[in-house]
Structures are given as structure tokens and as C-alpha cells.
Amino acid sequence: MFSSNKAPNHRLRITAGPRYDPQTHQLVHVNGPSPIRIRSPYLTADIWVRIKEYTGYPEGSPSSNPYFTHPTTSANRYSITLSLAFAEDVNGDDLLFGNDFDHPIRDYLPPGFNAAFKVVKTMLDPSIDGDAYSDTPYLYSPALASWNQFRVGELVPPDTKKAAVEADPVVLEGAEGSGKAVRESCGLPADAAARTKYFRDEETRKGFVLEKGRVYEADFGNPYLDFEEFAVHVPGITLNISKYVSEKNNVLRYVLKNRTTGEEYLVIGFTVVLDGAQEKTDDGDEVD
């Protein structure tokens, strides 16, 4: 949401937690091999964030990650990778992923925003929906139709903790173990692009259930959002929005939530720390 003209007082800090409340968040070590783990009554999640040409917090973070050399993911400029195990069944149509805000942003939207959104809706993600001009703006997509890669894993036995995950994974479309039968029984296409198109249909999403205790992996990213330059590059349009960043308008949230109940499962905050602002250094390994 944010061509090379990066303002010197802009640095990123990425945090993640189970709720909107930033007090529940922990610092994400961007481009690091290990995830942060988040537990809540709703799920257990492991989260990795990768960003090309990263210069943000914490100090000493790698500027890149091997993820960006993989043939499938090399075009992306950033990535949010998730490994999820839900505490209860979740209907596929209820699972939303996207951005929202707790304050109006209409006065901060740069010229060209509507044209850029039309390009996104028409060419990149037809399933996206939202209202950027409301008092509580949002842009959500059905998660199953918007994630670049989606992998169905094993079922974790009851009363068994979600196992530790491998370091620095690149999640690719497919399945592990008993997850292969799940994909086959649901008729999920093997190709990632075909799967996103498959799940654009509401009834198809309603017919898919993310099972309690089963591990699901997802990867989301794109080449359009440039956090180094604080610009959006969609086909035919570039929006440089660094000048719209302020102390009151400096957080881009990615949210995984339930459409029906409104419950948030995960909140990942991309915060622009302005020059002179105090940097938080919470290094916790896990948040409940």
C-alpha cells in the first residue's frame, strides 16, 4: 500500500499477534529462518515474513532471503508464509484474508487509488471486496482464493501439540501425507492458479472445511507492493505514497479472520517507524 526515492525517515517494523491489540503482538524477525509461533483459543500458527531489500527492524536483519531465489516465488517482493492448525472446523467461505483499518483513510488515499484498485479487481484478484472510504475501511478476499500457494498437511492427533516446523520453508501448492486424500476428495486442482480460480465460487468455498487439528500451509505475496520504495506498482500505474505516511497513518495490517463471527485469527502489522520514534524491541518467541 505504500519509485528509488525512499524517504530517509521511513523504516519498517513487523509484528504479529492473535488479536488487533498491539499488546498481544511480538516482533517478527524478517527474513530470518525461524518463524514466530502464536497460540490462541482459535488456532496455533507459525509465521514467516520475507521482504526484498529489507532495511527495517530489528537491527541486523538480513536484507533478503533464499525464498526470493526459488523459481516459483522469485517475482515476489514480499511474502507472508503461514502454517496453521485451527482449534475448530472453519468453513472455507468464512476464512477471510486482507487489510483493514480502525480509522478512516479516505483523506490519505493517493490520486489514482480507484484506478489501481480497479486493475487489482479486474486483473489480479477478482475475489477482493471492500470499502476504502468507510470509517472502518477494509479490503478482504476469501483466503482460499487469494493465497498464492496452499498446502494441505497432516491431521494432528487430539491433545497433541502442533509439531515444530522446518526452518525457512518455501510453501508450494500441494499436500503432505493424508492431506493428499483431502485434496483429491474435494477435487482441488493441483495447480495454484487453477485452485484460486476454483475457490472464487462461493458455493465451492462453502463446500470446503478446514478441519480442526489439520495443518494447512499458505504463502501470500506479490511483486506490486514495494516496501523499500514505499510504492505500489500495478500494471500501468505507480503510486508513491510515502508522503501520506504520518504518526496517525503508519500501519498496514494483514488480517486473517472469520467472516461470520468477526473473530480475528491473526493480525500482522507492517508499521512505518518515523525518525525519532521510539523503537520497540519485544523479542518474545511465542504469544498466547
Language-model regions, residue ranges each:
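Sterically constrained small-residue positions within well-ordered secondary structures
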Residues: P71, K243-V245
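Intrinsic disorder/low-structure terminal segments
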Residues: M1, Y67, L96, D100, ...
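Extended, solvent-exposed segments with strong compositional bias
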Residues: D125-K243
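Extracellular Ig-like/FN3 beta-sandwich strand-entry sites
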Residues: E247-R253
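Short beta-strand elements
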Residues: V251, R259-D288
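N-terminal onset of structured domains
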Residues: F2-A167
